[in-house]
């Protein structure tokens, strides 16, 4: 079953969660580390569970796991065995599912909303490199090598019971093609693919967003496609480009409006003056069916989206 379409058959919008790392930092975590939020899986997993709970309370219909930078290679570099790495990758799913089940067990949390789903985050190859190439896509490896890189983590996340895979911040069509080829090894699994973008027309490596949508549109296991980890001013035109070239649901979860410098690993500038919720309403009107937040967004931003999303007419 396609879990995204299952919800969209009844509800006009799926509200995603927001940033994990931002919330962990607000709770006192130091994420200046190549493992990023995966470091907290090792050290303080209960904090990750609390962030998931906060987003469900804010109105999120989907939790994205803390596995974006969780790779067998990354954990091995810290001296963890393959079995230990697998346990942590699976833990990212079980923590989110536990938070969801506890939240959903209370009747007052079930009003006018679908049961939330768990999306297992699969970051790009560049996230493992931690050198900023996730925003460029200029990898020096082949499509076949990308498949070999993604296979162990994808298999572990599926076996852990994730409802859907969130293949996110993908900077190049080559990596998306590798993921689609790999998905065929798991024919009952659905995924979304969301790209990082450099402007209102192109993903990070310069490929037209329209071409990405056209290519992905033909593949059954892709449950949704779209854009994340991108300045929010580019989102309206990117939705238009995608919508013209696919019949699949469009997903968007951009950054707050600040600019990330991958060289210094710092954020600069201010968040968008317009409320995040108001911007999100514009994205929905343009055709997005799954909306949330990426870097620097907070539960308050998700609450802004849920406030108007719950008033939309269900079918």
Curated annotation (Swiss-Prot):
Domain (Hcy-binding): residue spans on this chain: 2-309
Cofactor: Zn(2+)
PROSITE patterns per the UniProt record, alphabetical: HCY (PS50970)
Record-linked Pfam families: S-methyl_trans
Deletion consequences: Cells lacking this gene show reduced bacilysin biosynthetic activity.
Keyword tags: Amino-acid biosynthesis, Metal-binding, Methionine biosynthesis, Methyltransferase, S-adenosyl-L-methionine, Transferase, Zinc
Reaction equation(s) it catalyzes: S-methyl-L-methionine + L-homocysteine = 2 L-methionine + H(+)
EC numbers on record: 2.1.1.10
InterPro entries listed in its UniProt record: Betaine-hCys_S-MeTrfase_BHMT, HCY_dom, HCY_dom_sf, Hcy_S-methyltransferase
GO biological process, any: methylation
GO molecular function annotation: S-adenosylmethionine-homocysteine S-methyltransferase activity; S-methylmethionine-homocysteine S-methyltransferase activity; zinc ion binding
Chain sites annotated for binding Zn(2+): 229, 294-295
Top enzyme class: transferase
Name of the protein in question: Homocysteine S-methyltransferase YbgG
Organism: Bacillus subtilis (strain 168)
């Amino acid at each position: 079953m396609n879990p995204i379409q299952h919800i969209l058959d009844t509800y006009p919008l799926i509200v995603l969660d927001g940033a994990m790392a931002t919330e962990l930092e607000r709770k006192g975590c130091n994420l200046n580390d190549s493992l990023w939020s995966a470091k907290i899986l090792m050290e303080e997993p209960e904090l990750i569970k609390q962030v998931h709970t906060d987003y469900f309370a804010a109105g999120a219909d989907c939790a994205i796991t803390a596995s974006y930078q969780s790779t067998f290679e990354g954990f091995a570099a810290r001296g963890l065995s393959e079995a230990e790495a697998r346990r942590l990758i699976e833990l990212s799913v079980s923590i989110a599912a536990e938070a969801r089940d506890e939240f959903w067990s209370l009747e007052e949390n079930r009003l006018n909303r679908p049961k939330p789903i768990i999306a297992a985050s699969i970051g790009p190859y560049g996230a493992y490199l931690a050198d900023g190439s996730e925003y460029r896509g200029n990898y020096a490896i082949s499509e076949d090598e990308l498949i070999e890189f993604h296979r162990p983590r994808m298999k572990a996340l599926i076996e852990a019971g994730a409802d859907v895979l969130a293949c996110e911040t993908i900077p190049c069509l080559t990596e998306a093609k590798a993921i689609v080829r790999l998905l065929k090894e798991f024919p009952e699994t659905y995924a979304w693919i969301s790209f990082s973008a450099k402007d209102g027309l192109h993903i990070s490596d310069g490929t037209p967003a329209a071409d990405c949508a056209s290519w992905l549109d033909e593949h059954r296991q892709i449950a949704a496609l779209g854009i994340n980890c991108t300045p929010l001013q580019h989102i309206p035109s990117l939705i238009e480009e995608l919508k013209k070239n696919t019949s699949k649901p469009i997903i968007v979860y951009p950054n707050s409006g600040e600019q990330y410098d991958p060289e210094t690993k710092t954020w600069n500038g201010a968040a968008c003056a317009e409320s995040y919720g108001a911007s999100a309403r514009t994205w929905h009107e343009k055709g997005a069916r799954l909306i949330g937040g990426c870097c620097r967004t907070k539960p308050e931003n998700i609450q802004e989206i849920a406030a108007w999303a719950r008033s939309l007419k269900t079918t």
